[in-house]
Structure formats: C-alpha cells, structure tokens
Amino acid sequence: MSKRRIAPLTFLRRLLLRILAALAVFWGGGIALFSVVPVPFSAVMAERQISAWLGGEFGYVAHSDWVSMADISPWMGLAVIAAEDQKFPEHWGFDVPAIEKALAHNERNESRIRGASTLSQQTAKNLFLWDGRSWLRKGLEAGLTLGIETVWSKKRILTVSLNIAEFGDGIFGVEAAAQRYFHKPASRLSVSEAALLAAVLPNPLRYKANAPSGYVRSRQAWIMRQMRQLGGESFMTRNQLN
C-alpha cells in the first residue's frame, strides 16, 4: 500500500521538477535572446489577445512597434523613471526600502493595496508572466528580475520596458502610443506628452491619455516636477540610459 502511495507522489514530484526545469530553460533562453533581439510580443500582449478572441472581439489587435532607445525621446524614459522607479539606475532589481514601506502600508490599509515593483520587476512580469496577484507569480517574477538584471544593461531594461508597456486598450509600446495619441513618432514626444503617457501606466485600461481625468492631469504635473528634480535630460546621460 505504501509503495502505491509513494509512486504517484514521486511521479508528480519528478513531473513538477521537469516542468520547472523546462520553464527555466525557456525563460533563460528568452532573457539571453531578448538582450540583443527586439521583443516581438509579451506575455501580457498574448494574454490580452487571447482574452479578446475568447470574448468574441475578433477585431482586437494587441499592437506594438519596436523602436530603439535612439528613436525614443529622452523625456519618455525620464518620465517613466520619475513616475515608477526613481532609484532605477541604483538598485539591482528590487527597491527594498520601498517594499518595506508598502508592506507596512498594506498591513494598515488592506482595502488600499500599495505596490513597490521596480521597472525591472514590471518588465519581467509583463514580458514573461501572467496578470494577477499570487505568491507563485511573485516568486517567479523575483527570479526573472534577477535574471534580466544580471544579463541586461539598465538601458536595455528601460528599452524593453518602454516597448512592451501597455498604454491603452490594444496599445503596447511607446511608439504605438505616440502615434495613436499624438500623431507623431516616439522620438518627438515633448516633456508634457511623455509625462501624460507615464501618468496612465498604473492602470492604462482605466486612465486614458486621450481623455485624461483630473487625477491623470495632477499626476502628469507631479511627474513633470519629479523630472525636473531628477535633473532633466542630464539624468539620462549621466546614467547612460539614452
């Protein structure tokens, strides 16, 4: 009887280990490949596209146009850093003080959860993982974040992040967003336009760059102030991000 019980457990353990090993090889290969090759699509893009098809929205297209950092306005990278992760050039993928503050806040305010994800974590999640909040996904995200921080430069992380970020329904990447909302390439985005796009990033399906609410406008103004405090365009040059 004990042998019959042990055998299935052993099989499941081996199966789980093989799945994890296969995922590690797949994700490791992706990290290595995308360190030099443009990203054709992300896990979030695939998830949105499949969900649309399953919902009968066959006209939905998750659209993105890859551009290099040389073809992105320096204001755009600065705006995203100012809005999402001001310690981006300094940390190794995780902002530990911000995580500690978020945990303390969430213990006091369970109905208003605050995140502390860095740009590196967001990039790992958007590129390789599914939406949602679970300890499994967080654990995988942490491993992938360490992987991209080890293999990619900060400039590469920022480039990939800007190219796969969701800026609206079916709009992925800064080039597609610039063309849709401002009818210009990403290279010509102004300070205010870059700040407006960065302002919707916390929830681009709720906040609209083409119809900004009062909250989005106030966040845009705050981001512009933060951009000035960081040092403006010189911040990007000083940290070798453009």
Curated annotation (Swiss-Prot):
InterPro entries: Glyco_trans_51, Lysozyme-like_dom_sf, PBP_transglycosylase, Pep_trsgly. One of its GO terms (biological process) is peptidoglycan biosynthetic process. Signal peptide: none annotated. It is an enzyme of class 2 (transferase). Its EC number is 2.4.99.28. It comes from the Bacteria. Its main location: membrane. GO terms for cellular component: peptidoglycan-based cell wall; plasma membrane. This is Biosynthetic peptidoglycan transglycosylase. The gene is mtgA.
